[in-house]
């Protein structure tokens, strides 16, 4: 998905953009906290322990906002969050924002103790839910809807969060401003260019992504809801300093 996009944008911006993928969400967050990446496509940058690295938002995808959900199978006897107390509930990973951090915050606010089970990624935990290995799961609502439709099963949404803007593209402060601007503009302009939209469409087809394609210019202010969440969360390990 990413390599053709980075190749196109890099040539437009006059820089080489190389893809680096961490083995897990946790490793990605750790690398971001160290400032390992010049550019990053992740919402980990809003976690308090990562925010100190100073990443600055440049772009947002044109996708619809994302929500966190707690779901169960449609034929499950569980119809209320309180019924999850004491049960194993699945999550993608401990670093997944709408898949874990937001749902577990809600459960703890309601003083509902569950036993977290991690599936490694979104589809991993969704597969466990489908197989009946867990009674419920914390998920990205948009991804859950697509997965359930593709796999042919129905879910019941027990709870859904407010909407958050989808993943941003951000830049580390060590990157020269001129380079950051060139990369931002190259990515933002792709959808309006004949060759650029062709690259975006071809990449999207590889993963079944639906339009609209590409990126729009954005700033930190567009993602203030993340900062608001981390200031108010009851999860001490994720709470931002006042």
For the regions a protein language model found, what residue spans apply to each?
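Short helices/loops that flank or line small-molecule/ion binding pockets
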Residues: 26-40, 52-53, 82, 123-138, ...
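Short loop/helix-cap segments at secondary-structure boundaries that form the rim of catalytic
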Residues: 32, 48-52, 147-150
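Hydrophobic/proline-rich hinge and linker segments of small-molecule sensing/allosteric domains
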Residues: 57-80, 168-172
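Extracytoplasmic small-molecule ligand-binding "clamshell" domains
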Residues: 1-45
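Ligand-binding cleft/hinge of the Venus flytrap
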Residues: 3-16, 59, 98-118, 145-152, ...
